[in-house]
Structure formats: structure tokens, C-alpha cells
From Swiss-Prot:
This is Photosystem II reaction center protein J. GO terms for cellular component: chloroplast thylakoid membrane; photosystem II reaction center. It holds the Pfam family PsbJ. It is found in: Plastid, Chloroplast thylakoid membrane. One of the components of the core complex of photosystem II (PSII). PSII is a light-driven water:plastoquinone oxidoreductase that uses light energy to abstract electrons from H(2)O, generating O(2) and a proton gradient subsequently used for ATP formation. It consists of a core antenna complex that captures photons, and an electron transfer chain that converts photonic excitation into a charge separation. It comes from Pinus koraiensis.
Amino acid sequence: MADTTGRIPLWLIGTVTGIIVIGLLGIFFYGSYSGLGSSL
């Protein structure tokens, strides 16, 4: 875990990507559910 200098660990990329994707999907579905998604 300490040898991550000069290269981003793959688990960190996967975690950040997963959080971003889940966040975007959550915002999209919440917006469409509350009626704000129809105006996009």
C-alpha cells in the first residue's frame, strides 16, 4: 500500500469512479423523480 509513488493505485481509481457514477445516477434519478429531469 505504501508503494504508490508515481502511479495511482487501481483500487483508488475504481472507488472514485464508482462513487462518481453512483452520484451522477442518483442525481439523475432524483431529478427525474422530482420533476426536474424533464426540463434538462
